[in-house]
């Protein structure tokens, strides 16, 4: 009998697909997205797709087991391009009303130019969009 997460020798192990997507004008968020993607590559049994939010297709989104979204901070919020990405989930990709992202893992990261630039608020708005689509958002815990 196999335990959770174990695969028998005669079954091919399926890779966990992680979509890392972002918007970046200055290049800072892009560099952070690349670092996140490199981190995913370091985890055995995963594959990563790194794309700007405007280039993500419905197939990219729906085939992912986890979605990590990065944004620069604009007025203590996600960028307009990242907001449009989430709007496209419903209006372009047809995520709702079937909740096609339900139980997929979600995560966020943000870049800001100042110590108190609103990165926490921007990440919370990204995570709120994910939670509204019944995704699973997990925190590492600890002090921030």
Region roles according to the model:
Residues 21-23, 51, 109:
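Short hydrophobic segments within beta-strands
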Residues 15-40:
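N-terminal beta1-alpha1 ligand-phosphate binding loop
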Residues 34-46, 131-132:
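Short helix-loop-beta junction
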Residues 45-55:
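A short beta-strand-loop structural module common to alpha/beta enzyme folds
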Residues 54-142:
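Helix-loop-strand module that forms the ligand-binding subsite of alpha/beta enzymes
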Residues 2-4, 13-15, 57, 139-144:
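Glycine-rich phosphate/pyrophosphate-binding loop and the adjoining helix
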